[in-house]
Amino acid sequence: MSQFFRKGGIALNDTEWIQDFADRRLQYGVSQTKLAVMAGISREHLSRIESSKVAVTEEMKVKLLEALEKFNPEAPLTMLFDYVRIRFPTLDIGHIIKDILQLNIQYMIHEDFGHYSYTEHYYIGDIFVYTSPDEEKGVLLELKGKGCRQFESYLLAQERSWYDFLMDALVDGGVMKRLDLAINDHTGMLDIPELTEKCRNEECVSVFRSFKSYASGELVKHEEQDKAGMGYTLYIGSLKSEVYFCVYEKSYEQYIKLGIPIEEAPIKNRFEIRLKNERAYYAVRDLLTLSLIHI
């Protein structure tokens, strides 16, 4: 892996490798800070590597290349966190916001009402933190899709990754209530209508005993002729269980919401793994274990 960059089949020396690596990083449109966070090193250390002020080991080359390829704009699949809900067994909301989220509570808006039977909440953008005088409820963090994307910007500024944040949350006693992982299909690898048909024909081998499918073509009000065949969504597993899958044609969603032509949509399909309670906890534990192995 460390010899990924070559000229005419000849392995590059360290100086050439560093230059080629820096060029590829810029080509991908990735900042030093963003790449350093993904690689688990400081931005300063990466800067010193790219300026040849420190030697780069073979092990470091592998780590940097693996991190860089996660930002490859031509990658057919990308993964992201799409929903996070964590309960903290404390009434000290200031501690959660300051030490776990590493945000400034003074810049958050306070409302004296909440959801999930909480009595009040603080929010900034789509990042919500609920609290209640009930000790059993504690403090609840909720990040939906937009909230996850916004929180990623804060994590980047903090030079932290999702794995750093989740580790901090679990160490502080955080209890995973829900976690959605989304895999974006950028090339149309999945044929959702075909998957739906295979489920109907009992050609799908799975531990899940149920599936549901929906077609949302009636929502499209433009000139498309084949409305009935548009916008397929497939659920595998019971929506009431602690784990189920949702697969849908993201390109149609982007067309309906944003008016992006279907053929130009950057994401063709999305595969979501929705996990609750213990299933969410074990998924986070496994993700953290894998991230530690690669550090």
Regions found by a protein language model. Give the residues of each.
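DNA major-groove recognition helix of helix-turn-helix/homeodomain DNA-binding modules
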Residues: 57-74
